[in-house]
Amino acid sequence: KEGVRTVILGKPNAGKSSLLNVLLGEDRAIVTDIAGTTRDVLEEHLNLKGISLNIMDTAGIRDTEDVVEKIGVDRAKEYADKADLILYVIDASRPLDENDAEILHLIKGKRAIILLNKSDLDMQVTKEQEELPEEFPVIEISAKNVQGIEELEDTLKEMFFQGELTFND
């Protein structure tokens, strides 16, 4: 299917699957409190404010001894490499760590939007965080409470109509 190839990246339990469900308006991805619930790439097609997206939910990125989870992590990185756009979901209720550093390295030089999720909780990561590269828009969201999603959609629309996002067939 045609659309902006959009990959949701982040550590385990950051809220990637919850974000996908919110954007789709239905519970497509399994959401639990168990880190590593998503093992494989879940791909969905969605029309967001007139923009066609092929959106992919991926396994949380972390060092893991679990063989199956590791394949999912490697696959997430491969998909990120081919993405037109990366939605990097950060659990803002926890401080950034070396896994975040790895993801920030992965998205360098790509089109990305950084989403500080769980803004309904006590935030440990803010927009002013020096580790966050200035080249990317940073939006506070709460996937659980559907906050900040409108701002995300508007940012996507803006990027698209400014020609920053292109389609891949």
Regions found by a protein language model. Give the residues of each.
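Short alpha-helix of the ABC ATPase nucleotide-binding domain corresponding to the H-loop/switch region
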Residues: 35, 61, 69-73
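C-terminal-of-GTPase-core extension/linker across diverse P-loop GTPases
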Residues: 1-52, 64-66, 96-169
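Conserved active-site aspartate in kinases
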Residues: 57
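Inter-motif core of Ras-like GTPase G domains
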Residues: 69-93, 142
